[in-house]
């Protein structure tokens, strides 16, 4: 089990993030493609990222754009997202040697992705999700996505990991289970997200516990719903979640949103047995 940090908005540059990662004794940074400085054209300048990481003896994972929507009904949009994934996989292949040098070679390099809920139509008595209404079309998009990713990843030690956010829809669970039929896909458990929605994703996640390889670790509460808190500032049974991550040999991102909360979380782990 290794711990890393997210891309933090307070840090304006890659070097700012790396300096913080090194100071806190963390192993990796999860590069967030929602930030302008980590857009695909920037990430493709891999020599810059590799040189900076080697100087600090760290490596990277990648968080795909949260807006990623490979099932968009507009083929121009879905094809752009597919091309984004293809090129990001090529970036990850070039970053893999950093994992080999400074990480754990038993842990695949991960590209973290969210499930895009799609749009819904509000009727007088209910909301109808378009992906639920046109489920066959939705699943055809995921079949194409899975086939493409298997081809693009090839034999590289890279996994695309699906993260829980604000509650998986039933149609999303079916799509995720379809993806998990492929060895190139696994799961991320964001323990703060699940706490903030009353743990309703936990039964689904635990039914696929053998596919858990990545965790987003932060504290949270149910009432009021909060997440991305420093460890110890919420209601989560952190030891239970950390023990599961350890048993799964999972990589863990301390996904707070501020430097202060990240520092506090590292201190919390240092005081806990066997984590950092």
Segments and roles (model prediction):
Residues 1-4, 65-68, 123-125:
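N-terminal small/glycine-rich loop or linker at the start of catalytic domains
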Residues 2, 11, 15-22, 71-73, ...:
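Histidine-acidic metal/acid-base catalytic patches
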Residues 26, 58, 158, 185, ...:
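Short glycine/serine/threonine/alanine-rich loop segments
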Residues 30-50:
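Glycine-rich, proline-tolerant flexible connector loops at the mouths of alpha/beta enzymes
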Residues 47-65, 142-152, 238-244:
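Alpha-helix-loop-beta-strand connector modules within alpha/beta enzyme cores
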């Amino acid at each position: 089990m290794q711990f890393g940090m997210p891309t933090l908005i307070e840090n304006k540059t890659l070097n700012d993030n790396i300096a913080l990662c090194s100071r806190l004794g963390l192993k990796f940074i999860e590069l967030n493609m929602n930030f302008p400085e980590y857009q695909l054209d920037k990430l493709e300048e891999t020599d810059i990222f590799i040189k900076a990481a080697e100087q600090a003896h760290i490596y990277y994972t990648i968080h795909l754009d949260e807006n990623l929507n490979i099932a968009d009904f507009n083929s121009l949009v879905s094809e752009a997202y597919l091309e984004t994934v293809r090129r990001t996989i090529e970036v990850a292949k070039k970053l893999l040697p950093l994992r080999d040098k400074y990480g754990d070679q038993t842990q695949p390099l991960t590209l973290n992705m969210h499930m895009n809920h799609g749009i819904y139509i509000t009727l007088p008595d209910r909301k109808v999700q378009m992906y639920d209404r046109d489920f066959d079309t939705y699943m055809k998009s995921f079949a194409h996505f899975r086939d493409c990713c298997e081809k693009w990843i090839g034999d590289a030690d890279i996994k695309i990991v699906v993260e829980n956010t604000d509650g998986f829809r039933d149609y999303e669970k079916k799509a995720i289970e379809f993806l998990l039929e492929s060895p190139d896909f696994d799961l991320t458990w964001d323990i703060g997200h699940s706490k903030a929605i009353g743990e309703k994703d936990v039964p689904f996640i635990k039914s696929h516990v053998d596919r858990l390889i990545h965790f987003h670790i932060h504290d949270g509460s149910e009432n009021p719903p909060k997440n991305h808190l420093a460890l110890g500032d919420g209601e989560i049974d952190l030891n239970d979640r950390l023990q599961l991550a350890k048993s799964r040999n999972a990589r863990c991102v301390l996904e707070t949103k501020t430097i202060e909360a990240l520092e506090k979380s590292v201190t919390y782990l240092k005081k806990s047995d066997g984590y950092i």
